């Protein structure tokens, strides 16, 4: 039998190694992305959380009892600071005012007609986006498995 014209086995191995390193990397990356996809549910419907508030992750370092204490402290602090603010405004702004102005300030609850633009304001003053109209969303039924070619349904 004649001698093979292909490269020697040593060189063939070296070349295979250099190719396989990049292939191996690519294959690992694909496997990782596949395993991530498998973890997700197979449902196509958008995943909705029950509450619209952002998720809060608990840190394991604080015990539930400690968390409750901290909440109580925060509530006390906020109540005290609100009362202090009102008293502080009244004490400073009462100087140099007539009795009518003082009476009106007490009745209205604020001292001046200064703008609140660009300032942080406590309370429900910031509830400005109540009546936002959103575009209607439709659920797709056509061109999908089990859709029976029925038209798009409105999602309330």
UniProtKB/Swiss-Prot annotation:
Keywords: mRNA processing, mRNA splicing, Nucleus. Residues 1-98 are annotated as: Disordered. Residues 66-98 have a biased composition (Basic and acidic residues). Residues 13-59 have a biased composition (Basic residues). It holds the Pfam family SNRNP27. It is found in: Nucleus. GO terms for cellular component: nucleus. It comes from the Eukaryota. InterPro entries: SNRNP27 (IPR013957). One of its GO terms (biological process) is RNA splicing. Its main location: nucleus. Part of a tri-snRNP complex. Belongs to the SNUT3 family. May play a role in mRNA splicing. This is U4/U6.U5 small nuclear ribonucleoprotein 27 kDa protein. It comes from Xenopus tropicalis. The gene is snrnp27.
């Amino acid at each position: 039998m004649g001698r093979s014209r292909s490269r020697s086995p040593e060189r063939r191995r070296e070349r295979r190694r250099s190719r396989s390193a990049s292939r191996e990397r690519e294959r690992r990356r694909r496997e990782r992305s596949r395993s991530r996809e498998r973890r997700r549910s197979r449902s196509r419907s958008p995943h909705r959380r029950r509450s619209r508030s952002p998720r809060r992750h608990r840190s394991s370092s604080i015990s539930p009892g400690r968390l409750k204490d901290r909440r109580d402290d925060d509530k006390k602090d906020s109540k005290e600071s609100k009362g202090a603010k009102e008293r502080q405004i009244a004490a400073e702004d009462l100087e140099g005012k007539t009795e009518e102005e003082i009476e009106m300030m007490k009745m209205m609850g604020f001292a001046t007609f200064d703008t609140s633009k660009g300032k942080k304001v406590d309370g429900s003053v910031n509830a400005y986006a109540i009546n936002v109209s959103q575009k209607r969303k439709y659920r797709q039924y056509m061109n999908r498995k089990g859709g029976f070619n029925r038209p798009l349904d409105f999602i309330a």
